[in-house]
Design a protein with these regions (language model features):
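Membrane-interface helix-loop junctions in multi-pass transport and translocation proteins
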Residues: 2-19, 70, 75, 83, ...
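Interhelical loop/hinge segments that connect adjacent transmembrane helices in multipass membrane
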Residues: 113, 156-197, 201, 211, ...
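Alpha-helical transmembrane segments of polytopic membrane transporters and translocases
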Residues: 1, 9-29, 92, 199-201, ...
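Membrane-proximal transmembrane or re-entrant/amphipathic helices at the cytosolic face
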Residues: 368-371, 376-378, 400-501, 505-508, ...
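Helix-loop junctions and terminal segments of transmembrane helices
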Residues: 27-45, 107-108, 218, 222-266, ...
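Alpha-helical transmembrane segments of multi-pass membrane transport and lipid-handling proteins
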Residues: 53-78, 84-88, 128, 132, ...
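Hydrophobic transmembrane helix module of multi-pass membrane transport proteins
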Residues: 22-26, 55-198
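Membrane-interface junctions at transmembrane-helix termini in multi-pass inner-membrane proteins
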Residues: 36-45, 95-119, 136, 141, ...
């Protein structure tokens, strides 16, 4: 968050006006083709090559179209700087298409650690370039060229690590059906993305770049738990659920145990952020960002529900029903957009509250609709999560009462006061929260399961198995493979490595790629 001290809210706002649109096109190959690579039991070299050229061709057209749309965006936002920023950001679309298929092949080969290293290096380069250019006085251009650097580093790293070379396009079995599957997934992502970015569009259009900059930073912190918790877990969960989708009892058991862990973490983090949100902003972003802190406290209560709600996408994808996912996203779009329009009169704070309300309204209907084909009802989900919700509300209430008894504590000024309030309130809250969880569950079982899952999600562990053994998924784990090796999702037998021969196969897994702007990837499996 050093950038928040070097750039102004208006700088972030101008770039967000553009990335609201550009990240939708930037994610074309990431959302759809990687899921296809995961879903197929075997993918020939010819099919993988066809996917690469389709991705590159469509990506090139999107790059040119977006670069030419700059004047229209500038007219919409009444900000001439938007046109030039759009031209620069268009480069990220075409560059990204060079590496998405390679990322998918690495994920299929269970090489999550390699993908994590690529993403970490790309993010580090993004930060270095952005800070360097910001210190040199480049203002919002620092963010633009940092994004281009990130796209180039991700694509280059993927191609270097996964040394797969596509052949020229040719007729290959499954190209048409595979493309249709990918378009269903991407169509869902597009509706979901439009839904989750309508807030940016409305705030930028109605209130301008500066309020949008405040809102954007608050939103980034809001979805941080999702990108740090849900995205790594999705890489394991979707693959595992796909393999046990034929056994309803195992599917139900694994899914409920995973959302139990997410409920423990999400409800606690969400309630704590609602308590200390303003001080987090003071510490992380520095002076001048107080409005972002007020907005963030309205996001906080929705964090836990957001994490849980977004897991219903795992069900749609793992049972091979992306068309149901797409239909749900249409309903979701109507609901959330209506709430945004109703709340817009109250400014960015009203829109933030609309987000929180929308997750509470949609969570249980979303689980009901996703689980209907396999008999997963709302009752089991509610039975798993209500105790965590009750514990978080009770702990937050007690924390507020205790801290109000120390008025001098609340009035301490400056960063030191913010750090003291944040650390003390968080320690007190989590102490009370964990006590409440243990009492309601009559033991520490949820805490033990969470500890086991977090250990299993460490890179060295996820590179060895596809699912946490502690969640009862014996028989579906898979050994690691090199990029391009074949491994059937139903067993762990390995086949020859991929080459440029016509009938060679490549393997399946799933994951996510990191992005400086959280909007493109944080909801990869969300609705």
């Amino acid at each position: 968050m050093v950038l928040a001290r070097l750039l102004t809210p208006s700088d972030f706002g101008v770039v967000t006006m553009v990335t609201t649109f550009s990240l939708l096109f930037r994610s074309f190959g990431l959302n759809g083709f990687t899921e296809l690579i995961m879903q197929r039991e075997g993918i020939s070299h010819s099919l993988a090559s066809n996917l690469f050229w389709i991705d590159l061709g469509i990506g090139t057209m999107l790059t040119l179209a977006f670069a030419g749309s700059g004047p229209l965006l500038a007219l919409f936002y009444h900000n001439p700087a938007v046109a030039q920023v759009a031209e620069g950001m268009s480069l990220t679309i075409g560059i990204g298409c060079l590496g998405w298929i390679h990322i998918g092949l690495l994920q299929r080969a269970m090489r999550f650690r390699a993908v994590a290293v690529i993403n970490a290096i790309a993010l580090l380069l993004y930060v270095i370039v952005a800070i360097g250019l910001a210190m040199a006085g480049w203002h919002y251009w620092a963010l633009v060229w940092a994004a281009v650097t990130h796209a180039l580093a991700t694509a280059t790293g993927a191609c270097c690590v996964c040394r797969w070379i596509p052949s020229w396009p040719r007729k290959a079995s499954g190209t048409g059906s595979g493309f249709k599957f990918a378009m269903n997934v991407y169509s869902h992502f597009a509706f979901s993305y439009i839904t989750s970015n309508t807030d940016n569009l409305l705030v930028g259009w109605r209130y301008g770049a500066r309020p949008l900059g405040f809102y954007k930073k608050a939103y980034d912190l809001f979805v941080l738990p999702q990108s740090q918790l849900l995205s790594p877990l999705s890489a394991v969960a979707v693959s595992t659920l796909s393999r046990v989708s034929g056994d309803r009892e195992r599917f139900r058991r694994y899914f409920l145990q995973v959302i139990s862990v997410l409920a423990l973490l999400g409800m606690g983090i969400g309630a704590d952020f609602a308590l200390v949100g303003k001080d987090i902003i003071r510490l992380v972003l520095g002076p001048g960002w107080e409005e972002a802190g007020r907005i963030f406290t309205l996001f906080g209560p929705g964090i836990g529900v957001m994490l849980l709600y977004n897991t219903h996408g795992w069900v749609h994808l793992s049972i091979g029903r992306p068309e149901r996912w797409l239909r749900w996203s249409l309903l979701e779009f109507g609901c959330i957009t209506s709430l945004f329009l109703l709340a817009l009169r109250w400014g960015p704070s009203g829109v933030a509250l609309a987000w929180t309300v929308s997750y509470f309204l949609l969570m249980f209907p979303g689980f009901w609709y996703a689980g209907k084909p396999i008999g997963l009802g709302v009752g089991p989900v509610l039975a798993v999560i209500w105790k965590f919700f009750a514990a978080s509300v009770g702990a937050a209430f007690m924390t507020v009462l205790i801290l109000r008894a120390v008025p001098a504590f609340a009035m301490r000024p400056g960063p030191t006061g913010a750090l003291l309030r944040m650390s003390s309130a968080s320690l007190l809250f989590f102490g009370l929260y964990f006590v409440g969880v243990i009492l309601l569950h009559q033991g520490p079982k949820p805490l033990n399961e969470t500890a086991r899952l977090l250990r299993d999600l460490l890179p060295e562990n996820t590179s060895r198995r596809s699912s946490p053994a502690s969640f009862g998924t014996e028989g579906v784990s898979a050994a690691p493979a090199r990029c391009g090796e074949v491994k059937s999702p139903s067993n762990s037998v390995q086949s020859p490595a991929i080459s440029n021969r016509k009938h060679d196969d490549v393997n399946t897994s799933v994951g996510t790629s990191s992005e400086p702007d959280t909007r493109a990837t944080s909801n990869k499996y969300s609705s």
